[in-house]
């Protein structure tokens, strides 16, 4: 069991990554004035929160815009678990696919799919979006990933998400600190 887990966000722009992390942690990860003015993440954001079991989760909140994919790449190398966010109004979008491709190439295997903004969509439509997600991830490493519905503003579904993260992290082993260290260098 790993008592310290690093979670990364992934997903299309405006699917609620930063809002979810603020709802879970109370920390605003968009820290620059430009990010606030533009209403989107540009740089990596960092936060943390504790799970019901007492495990601490560090979070790397990545930008979802295609122009900032290099920033996303810089942030995901050390994560143990991915929260893949999908807006329940839009479903899988281009950056969702690109983020999945990148994370798959990096060998990341632990995912929770988070359907966001559920307050804006009827349940029947959400079920259709959920079916589309299941079809899209069939045959991939995400195939058995749980899909959790949340509304980050009202905090509906956050307790279920926290419990799911807690359960999912039981199987994540701590990094072997006896191995040779590896330092990823951003060559931009």
Predicted regions and their residues:
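Short flexible coil/turn linkers enriched for glycine and charged/polar residues
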Residues: 1-3, 40, 53, 109, ...
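Conserved G1/Walker A P-loop phosphate-binding module
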Residues: 1-59
